[in-house]
Amino acid sequence: MFSSFFGNTCSWVFIFIIIVDNEAFLHFSCLIFVFINIFVFLRGVKDIFSFFFLTRRFSFIVVIYYFFLVPRDQLRISRLFHKRQILCKDSRQLMTCSLGLFFKAQINIFLPPFALTVVQFLVNLVCHT
């Protein structure tokens, strides 16, 4: 019940922020990633299906955001855990980078630090080549 309400509320808030302010969307999405991870950690494994439902809905909104509302020539996305910016050459590379960041955000409480380092290396390799 709470997960469904939370998912619907987040979806509408994401859409509103995308329309109003692109930069705020990036920062707000990072906060939501952190909140969802804490929520899953506190609720335990029994609520993992609600977690995947929320992330699937959010990833759909991210796809809409990147392909329809962002200019295609030079696209900037904020890193989730660093203040530096990465510059993507085209929409395909942007989508690869954003999916990598999205994947890294979802596994940060499930994998040890070494695995996160490997994921970070792969994201950097894809985004800077």
From Swiss-Prot:
Top-rank taxon? Eukaryota
Q: How does it sit in the membrane?
A: Multi-pass membrane protein
- Which keywords label this protein? Membrane, Transmembrane, Transmembrane helix
Mind telling me which residue stretches traverse the membrane in this protein?
15-35, 48-68, 107-127
Reply yes or no: does the keyword Membrane apply: yes
Asked whether the UniProt record includes Transport among its keywords, one would answer no
Q: Which GO terms describe its cellular component?
A: membrane
The record's subcellular locations are:
Membrane
Q: What else is known?
A: Partially overlaps SPT6.
Q: What is this protein called?
A: Putative uncharacterized protein YGR114C
- The organism encoding this protein is Saccharomyces cerevisiae (strain ATCC 204508 / S288c)
